[in-house]
Regions:
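Rhodanese-like catalytic fold shared by cysteine-dependent sulfurtransferases
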Residues: 2-22, 28-60, 66-115, 190-193
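A short acidic, helix-capping loop that chelates divalent metal ions and anchors anionic groups
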Residues: 32-33, 96, 208-214, 315-317
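A structural preference for short, hydrophobic beta-strand core positions in alpha/beta folds
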Residues: 42, 87, 173, 201-203, ...
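Short histidine/acidic/glycine/proline-rich micro-motifs that form metal-
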Residues: 69, 175-182, 310-315
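Short phosphate-binding/catalytic loops that engage adenosine nucleotides
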Residues: 82-84, 197, 302
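ATP-dependent adenylation/nucleotidyltransferase module used to activate substrates
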Residues: 104-256, 260, 268, 291-292, ...
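Catalytic subdomain that performs nucleotidyl-dependent activation
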Residues: 170-171, 241, 249-330, 334
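The feature marks non-catalytic terminal segments
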Residues: 302-384
Length: 384
């Protein structure tokens, strides 16, 4: 039987265990789905606190959270209740680091983009590039990497596009450190090395700036991030920044605007910057489905962080049960339910903003001006 004086077990010790054990990941379901240790069972912390009989008492229980802090306290409490429970030292991040040390997937990942995911990812990426004119000759693009699956895939796709070299353009793989904890920074840099992505990292103090903001800190953080990315990209001679928003982000944004904002709008494939003259924002994953990105990640056995915010373990606004996180989750679930009735629902939502008939709209905005159907009502009648 495994014994530990401080209730801790390392990754190496766990791998060498010769007794049966249960590995329990206590993070929320979304974080677990985003990436987890092979063989782990997901029982969120709240459920264990409500009913610890969900855990076995007849064998070793190894508890895991993101960084090993929350699961450490839980392990101690469970031991007081008679469980043989230990905490995985360093949590999920320690397992990620061990993966980086043992595996190098860059070549296989690149091959998978050209072969297995040619139709579902590569072709849709290039279709967006062409259809929306996202990349043009002599562009210098800052490919913005947050550390998640979307931006890392986008970086690999841009490398593949550059390899084809049909016209001249330059790339900078830009990572902004807004005040990451050591573990988050390490995961991002390790993934970049593993995938052979030459990143340029710069630091800001955004997390300190939003730390005491009670209302919508995530929204403020996102806005500040974009501003810093524009500024740094321009300093590096770039004329565009590329963000990793995908097809599902687009249709969710359309519905969120209608249901929660009372407006019809979409997430555009490209935008002119309002504060940085000559700069543009592009979204090359605009036509790529999130399910295919997850498939690519899992097929290549890649592991990324869900949110690089240093407060994720304790910040309620990062929780799927909070207002900030739950609205998009509600929309995701709504779309999934509607798809069961109509398989075309996602495509219909996406194309709805391409098929707007202004003659059937009560009013619309163009710049700072609001146009009512009454302004042209008489002219519409004369035209019939």
């Amino acid at each position: 039987m495994f014994k530990s004086e401080n209730n801790q077990i390392t990754i190496e010790q766990m791998r060498k265990l010769d007794e049966e054990y249960t590995l329990v990941d206590i993070r929320d379901e979304i974080s677990f789905e985003y990436g987890h240790i092979d063989g782990a069972k997901n029982i969120p912390l709240a459920k264990i606190k409500e009913d610890n009989s969900l855990l076995p008492k007849d064998k070793l229980v190894v508890l895991c959270c993101k960084s090993g802090q929350i699961s450490d306290e839980l392990a101690e409490n469970l031991r007081d209740d008679g469980f043989n429970a230990v905490n995985l030292e360093g949590g999920y991040y320690s397992w990620l680091r061990s993966q980086f040390e043992n595996e190098d997937y860059a070549t296989d990942v690149e091959k998978s983009i050209r072969k297995k995911f040619s139709k579902t990812i590569w072709s849709r990426f290039t279709a967006a590039i062409i259809e929306y004119k996202l990349v043009e000759p002599n562009d210098k693009i800052a490919v913005c990497i947050s550390g998640g699956k979307d931006s890392m895939l986008m970086a690999k796709l841009f490398q593949e596009l550059k390899r084809h070299n049909k016209f001249p353009f330059e790339l900078v793989f830009l990572v902004m450190d807004p005040g990451y904890c050591v573990e988050n920074r390490d995961v991002i840099e390790s993934n970049a090395r593993r995938l052979n992505i030459p990143i340029t990292v710069f630091e800001t103090d955004i997390f300190n700036s939003v730390y005491n903001v009670d209302k919508y800190p995530c929204y403020l953080c996102a806005r500040m991030r974009r501003g810093y990315l524009y500024k740094k990209a321009k300093q590096l001679g770039c004329n565009k920044i590329a963000l990793g928003h995908h097809y599902d982000d687009v249709i969710e944004t359309i519905l969120m605007g209608m249901l929660y904002g009372g407006q019809v709008q979409t997430m555009m494939p490209k935008l002119h910057s309002t504060n940085y003259e000559g700069m543009e924002l592009i979204r090359p994953l605009y036509l790529v489905r999130e399910a295919e990105i997850k498939h690519w990640r899992d097929y290549n056995k890649l592991n990324f962080i869900q949110c690089a915010c240093r407060f994720t373990d304790t910040c309620t606004t990062c929780s799927p049960n909070s207002n900030t996180g739950s609205k998009r989750q509600e929309i995701k679930q709504l779309i999934a339910n509607l798809k069961k009735i109509n398989p075309q629902i996602e495509s219909n939502i996406f194309h709805s903003v391409e098929n707007v008939n202004l003659d059937t709209i009560i009013s619309y905005k163009q710049g700072d001006n609001k146009v009512s159907f009454l302004d042209r009502y008489d002219d519409m009648g004369k035209g019939k």
